[in-house]
Design a protein with these regions (language model features):
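Iron-sulfur-associated redox domains of electron-transfer enzymes in respiratory
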Residues: 1-176
Length: 176
């Protein structure tokens, strides 16, 4: 996959998974020390990075993430003995899949750090933001999502009512 420069105004959407031990403590320490990191990163907790499923990583891209990373305990210091090593193996496998489908394995990363490494936690977010900004938006974002519940959405020009023009109606609002 070739790297293309994109607008500086492109703000990537990044999903970060972190374990409840070192990853969470690093995030908490960063907050306590007021260490700044990009606001474009959405964090999701895992019991352990060893519980990371390749499907979760790939689904994050399907849901529109431009980049994904994991924050794991340091190698040899996992609270679940080898969970971080299992997480690394799953990231490696998911990278190969991303390369095979043409999305690019460089959009996925794993960082190892202890709970006291607040600056490393922030640096991981900065590193991924810069990398994804260089790579550009997730090409899957250009593909329209499937309609809810498998229903066909009306196409402008059909005889059907197209008043919502691709927007899904709010099911909580009553229509008379």
């Amino acid at each position: 996959m070739t790297v293309q420069r994109h607008s500086k105004h492109f703000e990537p959407e990044i999903t970060a998974f972190y374990c409840i031990y070192c990853g969470y403590m690093a995030a908490d320490t960063a907050g306590a020390l007021n260490v700044q990191y990009p606001a474009n990163v959405k964090f999701l907790r895992l019991p352990c990075t060893g519980k990371t499923d390749i499907r979760y990583l790939l689904e994050a891209f399907e849901q529109g993430a431009d980049g994904v990373y994991l924050v794991a305990c340091p190698i040899g210091n996992c609270h679940h003995v080898r969970g971080n090593e299992r997480g690394r193996a799953r990231v490696d496998r998911a990278r190969r899949i991303l390369d095979e489908i043409g999305l690019g394995g460089e959009r996925l990363e794993i960082f190892f750090m202890s709970g006291s490494q607040a600056h490393s936690f922030a640096e991981a977010a900065h590193t991924m933001t810069a990398r994804i900004r260089e790579l550009g938006p997730n090409p899957l974002k250009k593909i329209a999502p499937l309609p809810a519940e498998g229903r066909d959405m009306p196409v402008p020009g059909d005889d059907e009512d197209v008043s919502f023009r691709g927007r899904r109606p709010d099911p909580t609002q009553r229509t008379e």
